[in-house]
Structures are given as C-alpha cells and as structure tokens.
Amino acid sequence: MNVLEIVLKAISERKGEDIIEYDVSMVTPFVDTMIVASSSNLRQNNAIATNIREKLKDANYTGEIRQEGDSNSRWILIDLKDIVVHLFVEEERHVYNLD
C-alpha cells in the first residue's frame, strides 16, 4: 500500500466525510496531491489526524510528518511533502472553501 492509500484508508477508518483527492502537481511544484476531508467535531478531527500518523508509522513511513493545528483546531493540516492533508470540522470547511 502506498502513502496515499494509507492516508485515505486512515481517514475513512475514523469516519472522515466528503473525502476529496486533488492532483495539484500541475499547479504547484511542491505538492502532488491535496486531500480535503471533513469531520463532525474536534474530537473526530483529532482522531483522524492521530490515525494518519499512527498508520504511517506502522507502515514504516520514513518521511517527515509535519502538522499544523492542535487538539483545539478546527482545521488541521498534515504535510507529508508530496501529499498535503486538510482536515476540517465540517462548518470550518465551508468558511475556507478550498474545494
């Protein structure tokens, strides 16, 4: 299973909603894929972020995992270099309208 598949599965396992994967490789030289997903509350958002980190660790992912946002954040960004994941509490996703 590749990194993208691991991330998508980790989001689904924690009931992430409206998961959309974008190929942004033609738009930016820094990222190949952007994933946007929603959760119903802060607790679920954090559970998704934690599950992504744990599943990557279990798969022996050796790349850097950078995260912006903490347990009180309604938007968590996980930067895996070639993949960037945006996790939003549902209402916040509509405010920023990335997709």
Residue ranges and their predicted role:
Residues 1-30, 42-75, 90-92:
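Polybasic/polar functional segments that serve as interface/processing modules
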Residues 36-39:
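Short hydrophobic/aromatic beta-strand micro-patches
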Residues 76-99:
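C-terminal structural segments of small proteins and small subunits
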